[in-house]
């Protein structure tokens, strides 16, 4: 260590140094470094004050004078090996496995080079961004991603903002060809401020795309002017983004916003995962597993795609893309559309009139109470950024409670000649559908807007309508319990019929036995829709089993025992 060696191919002397970067277990434990062509070697060179000698041109040909000048890098490497062999200096050639950087599209080997670049000094700019998170003014959802944010900021280096690309925002720096003076200006100067020369050219580099992206929250609003848009929209509330660009985008927006405006650009960062293919692989052009969202939209609709991306999606977690899930979302959209069309067809026959809550039947109050609770649950989960859970609750309510149960319950009333009960059913159907559409709208905006505008005339668009809120007067706990009792009995009857292979078209007499008079009263008040849902020719309520055939098939629920005579 400390001695000088002579490079046989150039006759130039280089020093022998010792550094902890060298892996003593790899190869001989000795390695020649190139500070101008490797990022790790560059750091070693800085520590030991080594000269940075660039030997390549931008087209990857050799630039240093001598035999190899102008040769392609691959050819030059082969020629150097042959020359060392002829000089008797080549001991052996041993293949080693190591990481080689390649272009992500064409696979060409990337050759690192030292180039003059533009940098932003980050040490002082990072401190306010760190303090913003630690003080609570900025938060991450999930909270664990705040550690990623701090990890990058607390170990941040100066930011290289220049890129050698053909497109992008040009760096506003101008050079005088006469004296070499550099000028940074908003507009291109006509003359050099130093020598008065008129021969100037702009820096050929472009800005890092994340530099302009970091300014996006306020630069799009007229900043640095205090425009109405800037005053209203900045800072915003929530940024939704992927965990893979916390460093590239989120951090840079935060420190840029604080530096330029004195304010964090948002108070919450909601992190989502990546959409991967069905095998769990990241979608990429090189793998050819990418899916064009426009193709999905053409086949299934934008709403189905939006719902698919939100279903079962927890903040920060990756999701796998399955076509079956898109089909399921499309089927749900069809379910909503068909149910809405059924309701609107009945409304056309008998326009909806206002109905007092006291005029509603048990099933009406039940579904009104359920959608009331749904509004509360969905809002609470959205406030916690549990968007997937909120969507699942809306899905379950619309598909099961509203479509499969309530609409089927009220069909006999819609066909009834009795105006009062029909009016209550129509008012409830319309009211609950509107509430459901509003809760579904963030996930399926197009179909909900279309249905909403055709369903009512009071509001021009669902987008500017009021968000559903919990109402105490819509809380009907007793009716909820009562209808659950009926639903349990219906499930029991259907289970018996399925086990006996009785088709829905064949009606059968049903006995409901309970010693509790309140339970029998529930069935008495819901006899019609209970018979409809249970495919019963008659519903008989009694306190005991007397008169029921011994061979009757039975099913026990929490509140009653259901019998269906075998002969029936």
Predicted regions and their residues:
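Residue patterns forming the tRNA-binding/recognition surfaces of aminoacyl-tRNA synthetases
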Residues: 2-4, 12, 21-177, 249, ...
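Short Ser/Thr-interspersed hydrophobic loop/turn segments at strand-loop and sheet-helix junctions
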Residues: 249-259
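Short, conserved secondary-structure transition motifs
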Residues: 101-106, 243, 273-277
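Feature 926 captures the class I aminoacyl-tRNA synthetase adenylation module centered on the KMSKS loop
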Residues: 151-211, 215, 259-302, 317, ...
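NTP-handling and nucleic-acid-processing catalytic cores
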Residues: 1-59, 128-162, 191-196, 219-234, ...
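Active-site palm subdomain of RNA-directed nucleic acid polymerases
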Residues: 46, 52, 257-263
